[in-house]
């Protein structure tokens, strides 16, 4: 069953629609969402609406959780100003869908979480953190987001603990196949705000029956997002960073 993996969309409906158009040509049967539907860009409601229409299974991201708890958060800054703006525009059904997201999906052979399997708010962005993360799950395939960095950590058991290496996904198409004794921690990349120096939206399609995955990078109309950001009165760096992939 081909599984479409989406993460860190952050209200960027333009990027999401481009990804879905590309993914439809590749083919998929189900959608797993790795958190952060909202935040940063104006179309959080439309993003959640689209995820609901896809019958996506999803997990909670930190921005999703912040939006749901704004009434008790004592936080300032543009990140939270944007979330307050979005909260006023999220429809009731979409709010309810976000509120029901779990922090983790654990199916035994595979796991979905926003951050580390050890803690959904931890960034898996270093080898030592990844090594610890493998110790918190027995899943062969673990999927996460949060860092906005597309790539995979692969682990093999060694005499002094797991041997771990990292591979970034920087090509338009990045194929990954694992052996029977390997385990992986995969970040499909950010749909809405990549931070690895590449402006293209990231996503992946996983073939569980073949023990393989392909991660893709997709061009989209960043200028259209810039227009949406300007119209909403959000800070200019939010669209400027999209052109740089930072």
State where each predicted segment sits.
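Beta-strand-turn-beta hairpins that frame and shape the catalytic cleft
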Residues: 1-4, 105-112, 179-184
């Amino acid at each position: 069953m081909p599984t479409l993996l989406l993460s860190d969309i952050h209200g960027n409906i333009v990027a999401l629609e481009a990804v879905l158009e590309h993914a439809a040509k590749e083919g998929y049967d189900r959608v797993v969402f790795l958190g952060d539907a909202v935040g940063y860009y104006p179309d959080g409601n439309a993003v959640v609406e689209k995820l609901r229409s896809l019958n996506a299974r999803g997990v909670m991201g930190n921005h999703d959780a912040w939006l749901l708890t704004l009434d008790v958060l004592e936080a300032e800054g543009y990140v939270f100003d944007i979330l307050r703006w979005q909260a006023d525009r999220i429809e009731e059904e979409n709010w309810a869908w976000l509120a029901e997201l779990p922090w983790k999906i654990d199916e035994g052979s595979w796991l979905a979480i926003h951050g580390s399997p050890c803690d959904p708010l931890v960034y898996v962005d270093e080898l030592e953190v990844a090594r610890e993360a493998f110790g918190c799950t027995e899943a062969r395939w673990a999927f996460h987001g949060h860092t906005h960095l597309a790539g995979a950590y692969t682990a093999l058991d060694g005499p002094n603990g797991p041997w771990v290496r990292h591979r970034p996904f920087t090509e338009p198409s990045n194929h990954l196949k694992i052996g029977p004794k390997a385990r992986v921690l995969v970040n499909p990349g950010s749909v809405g705000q990549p931070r690895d120096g590449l402006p293209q939206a990231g996503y992946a399609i996983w073939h569980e029956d073949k023990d393989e995955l392909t991660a893709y990078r997709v061009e989209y109309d960043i200028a259209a997002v810039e227009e949406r950001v300007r119209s909403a009165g959000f800070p200019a760096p939010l669209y400027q960073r999209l052109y740089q992939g930072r």
